[in-house]
Curated annotation (Swiss-Prot):
The protein, known as: Trigger factor
UniProt remark on domains: Consists of 3 domains; the N-terminus binds the ribosome, the middle domain has PPIase activity, while the C-terminus has intrinsic chaperone activity on its own.
Superkingdom as given in the UniProt entry: Bacteria
Family membership noted in the UniProt record: Belongs to the FKBP-type PPIase family. Tig subfamily.
Subcellular location, record wording: Cytoplasm
EC number annotated for this UniProt entry: 5.2.1.8
Compositionally biased intervals (Polar residues): 439-449, 461-472
Species: Ureaplasma urealyticum serovar 10 (strain ATCC 33699 / Western)
Keyword Cytoplasm: yes
Catalytic activity: [protein]-peptidylproline (omega=180) = [protein]-peptidylproline (omega=0)
Listed HAMAP family: Trigger_factor_Tig
Length: 472
């Protein structure tokens, strides 16, 4: 074999390999015998039973195209081995994507010329990433947020009992009832509801309303005479007298849970044995939730700016196709959780299949480019993930599946690269946030106030751009 030529551009590298006549003839003879035996096993000729045609007789009926294809297919692995041991290949430090494409360039005088082409792994570069503009991030936990979580926890632990029809409403009871409000015997907008739930003594209604419900029982009706406060938000009702006709449907006795150390211990949280330790734990959970949520939002801002500033070499179609397939399967999997198929989704979103495909291609290109940029930034800034960090992350994830920890650890340990990529992405995002934390937009006051809203304490899912292909 001989290497005839090497052609390289920014997204592919092509080699032309000549298979000489002696090599071709040797493989051709072997292929001819192989095809002849195959032909003999299924050839039908008068005078011979099916499957018993002599090979020598079968050779007269061999398909030469099949022999040619068999010869070529048998030579391809040898050609690849020859090429990948050749200095022109081994001295080239280009990163190639997966297996090459192989085509026949020429067959002349018993010699075969193959074109072996590799897609090159794309390269993404960016001149600077210290000038990214980020919405201000507030990861602080406020007292009212902690107290709200405590109140919610107390409520969830309270003892509840539906009262029988002869028991009366008391302060602290939760009541389900219908009401209809009237002013001068005329119903007013927003003054009526059915099956409304109200905790007596919560002061959710206007003064005097809840107090007049005390002592009523299930099935009882009563007209409550009240007066809207002079500073009531609805100016057409402010200062006016009204009558509310109420019908009691259900009364639930609610015995509040006392906030004490026993209550704190009941959650079986690590190192939580007192009320203060519970508050500290909730405080930390709120901070973690805000960090995750704000990191995810910041990544969306960072990603768009990185894409706008980056230079990316052409992305091979093979990579795009693979990422499109992955993204499509993710969409289908997510839809299946809501018992919706892709066709129904497209109808609901008013998209054609071609539009959906275009969106996937665009997203795939961005995902690939961002993965490359994350790797590039990590390499430039020497950001790495240690094996111990991977093990620690796997252990953390396993804790979320009580009773299945060992199985989860075993499964994740079989694919540590995925965990490492997740952690590397997270480290790079945190690095970029810290690097650009002072690059704020001009109007930040409203944004800061919005970030004080109560977050979900449950851990948010961090956005993760995964690597699209293993490099050769």
């Amino acid at each position: 074999m001989k290497l005839l030529n090497k052609i390289k551009n920014e997204n592919a590298i092509e080699f032309q390999v000549l298979i000489e006549k002696s090599e071709w003839e040797k493989k051709h003879n072997e292929a001819f015998e192989k095809v002849a035996k195959k032909t003999a096993s299924k050839l039908k000729i008068p005078g011979f039973r099916p499957g018993n045609v002599p090979v020598e007789e079968a050779k007269k009926h061999v398909n030469e195209i099949e022999v040619f294809e068999t010869t070529t297919n048998d030579l391809v692995p040898q050609a690849l081995t020859f090429l990948e041991q050749d200095e022109s290949f081994t001295s080239d430090n280009s990163e190639t994507v997966d297996t090459p494409s192989i085509d026949i360039l020429d067959f002349k005088d018993g010699e075969l010329t193959l074109k072996i082409a590799y897609d090159l792994y794309p390269v993404a570069t960016i001149d600077s990433y210290n000038d990214l503009v980020l919405t201000p991030i507030v990861n602080e936990a406020f007292d009212h947020e902690v107290n709200a979580e405590i109140e919610h926890a107390l409520s969830s632990k309270s003892q509840r009992r539906v009262k029988d029809e002869n028991e009366l409403i008391e302060k602290g009871d939760e009541v389900r009832f219908d009401f209809k409000g009237m002013i001068d015997n005329v119903p007013f907008q927003g003054g009526s509801a059915k099956d409304h739930l109200l905790t007596i003594g919560s002061n959710q209604f206007i003064p005097g309303f809840e107090d007049q419900m005390i002592g009523l029982k299930v099935g009882e009706q009563k007209n409550l005479e009240v007066k809207f406060p002079d500073d009531y938000h609805a100016t057409d009702l402010a200062g006016r007298s009204a009558v509310f006709e109420v019908l009691i449907k259900e009364i639930t006795s609610v015995k509040p849970q006392e906030l004490n150390d026993e209550f704190a211990k009941s959650f079986n949280l690590p190192n939580v044995n007192t009320v203060q330790e519970l508050k500290d734990y909730i405080h930390n959970q709120i901070v973690l939730a805000k960090q995750e949520r704000n990191s995810e939002r910041a990544w969306l801002e960072i990603a768009q700016q990185l894409l706008a500033k980056a230079k990316v070499t052409p992305i091979p179609q093979s990579l795009i196709d693979r990422e499109v397939s992955t993204l499509k399967q993710q969409v289908i999997s997510q839809l299946s959780q809501y018992k919706i198929d892709l066709k129904q989704y497209l109808e609901f979103s008013k998209k054609s299949e071609s539009q959906f495909q275009e969106d996937l291609v665009k997203q795939a290109k961005e995902t690939i480019a961002l993965a490359l940029l994350v790797d590039d930034i990590a390499e430039n800034q020497k950001i790495v993930v240690s094996d111990d960090e991977v093990k620690e992350r796997i252990a953390e994830m396993a804790k979320l599946y009580q009773g299945e920890e060992e199985a989860i650890i075993e499964r994740l340990s079989q694919n540590p690269d995925a965990v490492k990529e997740f952690l590397l992405h997270k480290k790079v995002v945190n690095y970029l946030i810290d690097l650009n934390k002072n690059n704020q937009p001009k109007d930040t006051a409203s944004t800061l106030s919005k970030q004080e809203d109560k977050p979900k304490v449950a851990k948010a899912k961090t956005s993760n751009t995964k690597k699209v292909a293993s490099k050769k």
